[in-house]
Amino acid sequence: MAKDIGLDIPEPTKECDDINCPFHGELPVRGQIHVGTVVSAKMDRTVVIQQRREKLINKYQRYEKRQSKIHAHNPPCIDAKVGDIVTIAECRPLSKTKSYVVVKAEVKA
């Protein structure tokens, strides 16, 4: 049985025994929530999410494209793949570069 993490996100259908899973483990989530696309899933239980945005340049009244990459923990119950649109939530630092965990994955058609 999955626990409530405090967000309006449905519980995953699969079970896992990962201690760093916000639904089945001991990891609390707090802080920022981001949405992005998975660009790499080659690491063990880690995905790289690319987040794209547009920033207004006031002088020219035009937008420039910007992007950033965020490393996030990928629990086995969610198991996001490359190309999926995921929602990540901030948590305590899990490693040198990971401070986010995947809480929802939508399969891209």
From Swiss-Prot:
Coiled coil: none annotated. PROSITE patterns: RIBOSOMAL_S17 (PS00056). InterPro entries: NA-bd_OB-fold, Ribosomal_uS17, Ribosomal_uS17_arc/euk, Ribosomal_uS17_archaeal, Ribosomal_uS17_CS. Keywords: Ribonucleoprotein, Ribosomal protein, RNA-binding, rRNA-binding. It holds the Pfam family Ribosomal_S17. One of its GO terms (cellular component) is cytosolic small ribosomal subunit. GO terms for biological process: translation. Transmembrane segments: none annotated. The keyword RNA-binding applies. One of its GO terms (molecular function) is rRNA binding. Part of the 30S ribosomal subunit. One of the primary rRNA binding proteins, it binds specifically to the 5'-end of 16S ribosomal RNA. Belongs to the universal ribosomal protein uS17 family. This is Small ribosomal subunit protein uS17. It comes from Methanococcoides burtonii (strain DSM 6242 / NBRC 107633 / OCM 468 / ACE-M). The gene is rps17.
